[in-house]
A protein has these predicted regions:
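Conserved RNase H-like, two-metal-ion catalytic cores of nucleic-acid enzymes
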Residues: 1-105
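Mixed-charge, glycine-rich, non-catalytic linkers/tails in nucleic-acid processing enzymes
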Residues: 78, 115-155
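A basic/glycine-biased coupling hinge at the interface between accessory DNA-binding modules
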Residues: 106, 110-117
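Hydrophobic/aromatic-lined pockets within catalytic cores
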Residues: 91, 95, 107, 147-150, ...
């Protein structure tokens, strides 16, 4: 696989199949900014992860999950300075492990985890096209909501 090149700061979302990131399968990562909308299956990411350590600023939802899964798989991430989950928590917004709760309260239409994968413990992995679309929607929400969350934190 060729190296991934992304221009500008970006949001990323790491999708897993299940609710326990310590043991469940990582599916892939979505990248989003005004120039890029990209989904990378996790097995492909492991072959070309260098962009995760670039100087570009990155933001995510649940950095602890992202960091743990990457480390567990011998990967690293640098310059991830904003966690939407922590920001929303500090602002007393409705947060859960499922980013859809927060996004839908902010007028995004993101499917809840169980709508895409089925009940926890009985999940079914859908086609990669569905995973990619749903994961990119989540990274888009992270990217587009960052400024508003930062402004609310500063006020």
């Amino acid at each position: 696989m060729e190296k991934v090149k992304i221009e500008g700061d970006y949001a990323l979302y790491l999708e897993i199949l299940g609710s326990n990131y310590h043991k469940d399968k990582p599916l892939g990562i979505a990248i989003y900014n005004e120039n890029t909308s990209l989904y990378i299956p996790f097995e492909v990411l492991k072959q070309a992860p260098d962009f995760l350590c670039s100087e570009q600023e990155k933001y995510t939802y649940d950095l602890k999950k992202v960091w743990y899964i990457l480390k567990k798989n011998g990967l690293d991430i640098k310059n991830c300075h904003f966690d939407t989950m922590i920001a929303a928590y500090l602002l007393n917004d409705n947060i859960k492990d499922d980013i859809a709760y927060l996004a839908n309260n902010k007028d995004y239409n993101i499917s809840f985890y169980e709508e895409v994968y089925g009940k926890i413990g009985k999940e079914v992995e859908p086609d990669i096209e569905i995973i990619a679309k749903k994961t990119i929607e989540k990274s888009r929400f992270i990217y587009e909501s960052k400024t508003e969350l930062e402004e609310r934190l500063e006020s």
